[in-house]
């Protein structure tokens, strides 16, 4: 019985911590003069707490595993909600596709530049000497 209670406690603790970060993010979003979704701020709060090791990762792992396991199911309501605006999406299909393509390219360039900035130029494995 003690093992079962321990497992239940781990799941409850994980979800309480995840939701505490979410609601802290929602609260901070309501105070900020710019529009940033509270869920994004909550994720950043959780990331900072984990990165600074203020919050041990083992405390949130059980809840994260459950959320990741059922992630596809969690997108179903969002897909149904988007279908309510099908006519609007069909009318704006071109601009949506163009903005998605451009933003994807911008992300590729920024990640590539950041990676080169952080890691510097390294010799590729199997590559002979480079001419400079």
Swiss-Prot record:
Residues 1-6, 52-62, 114-132 are periplasmic. It is a multi-pass membrane protein. Residues 28-30, 84-92 are cytoplasmic. Pfam families: LrgA. The keyword Membrane applies. InterPro entries: LrgA/CidA, Uncharacterised_UPF0299. GO terms for cellular component: plasma membrane. Keywords: Cell inner membrane, Cell membrane, Membrane, Transmembrane, Transmembrane helix. It is found in: Cell inner membrane. The chain crosses the membrane at residues 7-27, 31-51, 63-83, 93-113. The keyword S-adenosyl-L-methionine does not apply. Belongs to the UPF0299 family. This is UPF0299 membrane protein YohJ. It comes from Salmonella typhimurium (strain LT2 / SGSC1412 / ATCC 700720).
